[in-house]
Amino acid sequence: MSPCENDTPINWKRNLIVAWLGCFLTGAAFSLVMPFLPLYVEQLGVTGHSALNMWSGIVFSITFLFSSIASPFWGGLADRKGRKLMLLRSALGMGIVMVLMGLAQNIWQFLILRALLGLLGGFVPNANALIATQVPRNKSGWALGTLSTGGVSGALLGPMAGGLLADSYGLRPVFFITASVLILCFFVTLFCIREKFQPVSKKEMLHMREVVTSLKNPKLVLSLFVTTLIIQVATGSIAPILTLYVRELAGNVSNVAFISGMIASVPGVAALLSAPRLGKLGDRIGPEKILITALIFSVLLLIPMSYVQTPLQLGILRFLLGAADGALLPAVQTLLVYNSSNQIAGRIFSYNQSFRDIGNVTGPLMGAAISANYGFRAVFLVTAGVVLFNAVYSWNSLRRRRIPQVSN
């Protein structure tokens, strides 16, 4: 038992603060290495433009692919053994893998370690499950919205810090620094997260069929998983072409990388500001209204992005898009809380993470394919169509949920 654990009631607000810090540290740790990932691939012996692009894409995507496979297993284990244990397992496991990445000698070793990183991940979904099972239901939207800003903040600061560290100390030391950040996350979680959890034997665990039947509305929960996937597809589809699109808009300027970095970052800043506020509003008026409104608002912003003429116009639209995006995943997570029990929260949030990871893999592939065949501007129009489908699909699923309530 950690020093912070005793017989006193759990202070969920303190747990929220510590979990936020953990999500911030893991978000920063994951994104620290992103700016120079292709450079490290090249350092490991990959040469040639096409080979470098291919391997960079593979080592980036494989982490999400293996995370989507492993998440349900870790979610089930969290429901059996406790969410805090899964937070500790994830932070320590990822820290060890980061050290090994810094020692990799060839691309195959690095590829295997990136896959292992995905297998051992899962800090954020388990943090979501932990907080969701402790926070009062009428504060779920605010709490999960606030928690989401931890990972966003870390992901925003990570690339800047990673780039500076790589320039100052070289590529390999950044992996060791990242590992130390994850180990710090491990100790913060160990000593300051409290959870009263009664372990459940494997025989007493609900099987998949029982998990489904225990849900208040299984079809709605599945539709929320699909909504999460589409949100990530829409977000990821723009990532591969953003820098090239900015270069096309900016023309012959010397600081395209800086401008692209700023435009890539502004949605995260906006989400950071909007997520807790819109989460709190969702607690008052209903997360389903926030979800549908934010999706429609996103469509209305994506369409004009295809017609902008300057980087400034694109940056303003992406800032507004980030404000809407900051409400989407917390609204989905709040609806999942409303429609599942604490007994299966770990698995529900992990299944949702699997769909999110699949979206992280397929989104960039979709964006790259569309831009290669139809140009950069078409990506925004197709993405707007995908999000519009998501809005209609989500509205229909949520509307069907309300019909029985009215008839009853």
Curated annotation (Swiss-Prot):
The keyword DNA repair does not apply. Keywords: Antibiotic resistance, Cell inner membrane, Cell membrane, Membrane, Transmembrane, Transmembrane helix, Transport. Belongs to the major facilitator superfamily. DHA1 family. MdtG (TC 2.A.1.2.20) subfamily. The lineage of its organism: Bacteria, Pseudomonadati, Pseudomonadota, Gammaproteobacteria, Enterobacterales. GO terms for cellular component: plasma membrane. It comes from Escherichia coli (strain 55989 / EAEC). It is a multi-pass membrane protein. PROSITE patterns: MFS (PS50850). This is Multidrug resistance protein MdtG.
